[in-house]
Amino acid sequence: MADDYRRSVELERRIFELDNKCATLRTEKPDDDYLQNASSILDKLKTYYRHGGESSSLPKLLQDYTQVVLDITFYEENKLVDQEFPEDSSPFKIQQLLQDLTEPEVLAGRLVPAQEVQSVLGLELLECLYWRRGALLYMYCHTLHQRKQWIKKNKATFLKCLQEGVRYLMRMLQVRNSVKLNDGVVFHDSATANFLAEGIFSDTHLLTMMYIGEMCFWAVKYEDCSMDTTERKEDRLHFRDIGTQILHKYVLACEGPLQGQGWNTENAKEILSILQ
């Protein structure tokens, strides 16, 4: 009973902290859709706590809390993108956003230890948390990639961002276990079966593959001429192998079942010709 109360209080504290943050951000842009949605959910959560809700609702509270985090950080990310990631403030702001997007998963594991995190938050929210962190680092690295002089002075930092981004995006692809084709599931066409077997469940999964391929390409480009990193060799990702494997799947999907659906493979093929 005491543990349940402690968990509920911890989440309540975070909710009211987010409410203050959301209110401050709304003074910048009152009509922002994401901040309005976050504010609406926060009002519901505050009402719940004021009326002494049941602790058994903790998973649902965590899901709502996670959606608030996603909405608020999306607004903050858009500000960074619009400002083209200022060199002086972006590193700190990005680490802050990554921490904010990690907290729901950490809280779910700590506050509902008897259940797996993906059961508490749900597959879609957990996927979104990984996607958002990986996509943020992709956008940041895409901008840095155009700042050649900056990279010359900060290769290790650039490679670290690429490695973190690829790890997050790979985790996103692994949230849903690939469907086994012999587990009794009946598919109406082989294309659907192949998609699910490869872990491709949506357009976002395909875009994730392309992002991974590009980030691996950038890493290989600079990793070959920057071996002074202090990270242990066994902890580094094999960017060339990962990029090649992921982009092969991407091209096969886009030129196979998805042919004519607007997916372009020219860039993927060009990267593959360099990685292989």
Curated annotation (Swiss-Prot):
Give compartment(s): Cytoplasm, Cytosol
Q: Name one GO cellular component term.
A: cytosol
Pfam families referenced in this protein's UniProt entry, alphabetically: RIMC1 (PF17716)
Q: Which domain of life is it from?
A: Eukaryota
Which keywords belong to this entry? Answer: Autophagy, Cytoplasm
Which InterPro entries is this protein grouped with? RIMC1
Chief place where the protein resides? cytoplasm
A GO BP term here is: mitophagy
Family per record: Belongs to the RIMOC1 family.
Entry function: Plays an important role in the removal of damaged mitochondria via mitophagy by controlling the stability and localization of RAB7A. Required for the recruitment of RAB7A and ATG9A vesicles to damaged mitochondria and promotes the stability of RAB7A by inhibiting its proteasomal degradation during mitophagy.
Full protein name: RAB7A-interacting MON1-CCZ1 complex subunit 1
